[in-house]
Amino acid sequence: MRVGFVFALLVVSVIVCFNGLTSAESTVVMNNRNPDSINVPISDDITSRNLRASGEERAYAFVDKIKSLFSRPGISQKVESLQKNPAMVKNLEKAALSQKGSSKVRDWFMHMYNNSSKRDKFFILATLVMFPIGVWAVVTNYRR
């Protein structure tokens, strides 16, 4: 039961934290494409409004994002070229593990640190501290 609870908690956390599924702001323009409801008259003065499933803003944006990800021809061509050329993959691995690459990552983190507010820094630090504690708690409870 504990494993199922941890898995359910993980799924709920991922869904809540995924901004594309939880926000409807990016799809306001997309709603003009198709009508979002059908007005059905019940009587002379009452009209029932039935929403269509395609009118749901959040799910519609999520589906469009997934479709656009798979419809980009550049990504599949790059993956195919990397699969054909293993030397290029090794060069990418060397560049990622070299000191030059790590200094760029370090510079990026310093830039993000310098441009974030105290509240953002607090939540980042709290997340970094609480994650290992949470992993430890799950592992110790799983062993019982």
UniProtKB/Swiss-Prot annotation:
**Positions of transmembrane segments:** 122-142
* Induction details: Expression is induced during host plant infection.
Q: What happens when the gene is disrupted?
A: Decreases virulence on both potato and Nicitiana benthamiana.
Top-level lineage group:
Eukaryota
Q: Where does this chain carry the motif RxLR-dEER?
A: 49-58
In the UniProt record, which residues carry a glycan? N115
What is the membrane topology noted in the UniProt record heading this document? Answer: Single-pass membrane protein
Instruction: Alphabetically list the UniProt keywords.
Output: Glycoprotein, Host endoplasmic reticulum, Host membrane, Membrane, Secreted, Signal, Transmembrane, Transmembrane helix, Virulence
GO CC aspect terms = extracellular region; host cell endoplasmic reticulum membrane; membrane
Quaternary assembly = Interacts with the C-terminal portions the ER-associated potato NAC transcription factors NTP1 and NTP2.
Its domain description in UniProt is: The RxLR-dEER motif acts to carry the protein into the host cell cytoplasm through binding to cell surface phosphatidylinositol-3-phosphate.
Listed name of the protein? RxLR effector protein PITG_03192
UniProt source species: Phytophthora infestans (strain T30-4) (Potato late blight agent)
Q: From the UniProt record, report the name of the gene that encodes this protein.
A: PexRD28
